[in-house]
Amino acid sequence: MPFTADFETTGETNLEKDGCVRVWLWSLVNCNTREEWYGTTIESFIDELKAQKCDYVFFHNLRFDGSFLLNWLVDNGWIYGTHYTCIIDKLNVWYEILLNLGFACRIWDSAKKYPGCSVQDVAELYGIKGKEEKPNFDIYRPIDYQPTEEEIEYCLQDSRIIAYAIKEDWDNGYKGMTLSSDAFKEVKESIGGYMGWRKHMPKLTKEMDKFCRRSYKGGWVYCNPKYQGKVIEDVNVYDVNSLYPYVMETKPLPVGKPFPGPPNKGELYIVKFTTEFSLKPKHFPTIQVKHSMHYSETEYIKETVEPLELTLTSVDYELFHKHYEVYYERDHKY
């Protein structure tokens, strides 16, 4: 059963006087029954999670609220791997805090379900009443501070709004941790479930998977040497909305089980080969290599200093020939 929660925390006023900040108010809402609870310490919050047997709890922006929770767990002797675990990636993106409360209590980030949306945005998205004006929270609050009814109501609003949205999603079968996982689940169901998915995207052998992954590249980011190290004014910035979905809808993409050997005309492919080359005049460099003693991983190569092994998709291979003078190629493997 899903629940939603929110923390209100002290700010600079308390930090300057006490040397620390803390949670001074929390709210908890049952998404199905709309029952509500609130309290003033993380300890009482944990107790309520146990009492209500909360197996899923959503905070909107887990990185903020979760940092107070993890700090409290460490300070109070909870042992990582025994009493709790968490999923936080190298970019400090928070996905889950898992508490062992005698049962598994999974704390997730509702901002991953509604990316880029504030709580107010979520209210507008679902056509429900939004948040009221925020009370003055920038005051000093001693340890025994008792929140006002106005402050309690404001804290509960956040949890109510997200609770409404989560219930709508769960009622429609969208019970994933993130919007991406919900979308992935729907795609699989639309093509025949797991078996249909595996028909289009078969599981590869480790060797074949490794070969394909070598061709994977990120976006092209490049600064013209003509402008490097200079302050440029009156710059125009352009963006393309929904470029990834556009490409997925209109351009050919690889599906199905790949096969070794030269491709037929018009087919997508990945090719590994050894080559040497230099950049054509008035063209852009497009090739980067990893784990090389001769080139920086962030450097686009203008000219090779030794034979270089590349693994490229057919799209990048075509681009490679368009922008580089290729001296030779050998040992092609498709």
Segments from the language model and where they lie:
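Conserved acidic
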Residues: 2-4, 18-61, 66-334
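Ser/Thr-glycine-rich phosphate-binding loops at phosphate-binding pockets of nucleotides
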Residues: 7-14
